[in-house]
Amino acid sequence: MRAAKQSSTGAENHLLKALPENEVERLLSESTPVLLKRRQILYSSGNIIKFCYFPLNGMISVLSTTESGKSLILGIVGNEGFVGAAALLHPPIAPYEIMAQVETRALRVKAEVLRTEFKRGGKFQQLVMRYLHQVLSQISQSAVCHRFHTVAQCLACWLLISADRVQTEEFSLTQQCLSQMLGVPRTNITMIAAKFQDAGLINYRYGKIKIVDRQRLEKAACECYQVAKQEK
């Protein structure tokens, strides 16, 4: 519980930070600090949501997955929000697969605790409604991105969004992860990442990505990145 107390003053989760003291203390008193492993699946599509997670660092992916196991990224959640919002609906069923993309520290809260706090109608309810608007916008924009933009544009966009979520220009993402996120063969990712590296936009080695020239990478990305920045 010590880690949870630190987050109330350390502002590691922006949504919790924005709550009045009485509301955040109610949530923190019912929270459990957890360390999510890389590629740990929190929910599969169709699962009943029993817990919600407030990331303190790292990033969690929202994925649409077919019966054959193919996936496509719809959104990325960092410490600006939380995952498991469908727990506030009836029935509380996960519409998408939710996976920790990298090792992530988070606060885990029982779904019924969030439902109770939401029904109080305080600041938490207001922030959740605003945050859900951002999430829905990101998912809608993702559909446009995957349909109309090139793989290179999409890759640049999601690299930038990932960096924003983890709040550093250097982070871990394997080519296999990127392939799954974008729903394209790994060879496509290898080829495009090599071009980005040759052009001096990124450094990529052993699953470690470093954005070297953010300004030029933003120019290589589709307009979806600017939309994502405005929604954040």
Q: How does the language model describe each region?
A:
Residues 18, 76, 108, 172, ...:
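Short aromatic/basic micro-patch
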Residues 22, 57, 81, 112-113, ...:
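Alpha-helix/helix-capping structural signal
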Residues 27, 63, 85-86, 116-117, ...:
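Residues that scaffold the ATP/ADP-binding catalytic core of kinase and kinase-like folds
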Residues 75-133, 137, 141:
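Cyclic-nucleotide recognition modules
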Residues 1-37, 82, 87-89:
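Cyclic nucleotide-binding regulatory module and flanking cytosolic helices
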Residues 161-232:
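Phosphate-/nucleic-acid-contacting segments
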Residues 40-102:
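Cyclic nucleotide-binding regulatory domains
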Residues 101-103, 118-185:
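Polybasic "coupling" helices that flank or enter modular domains
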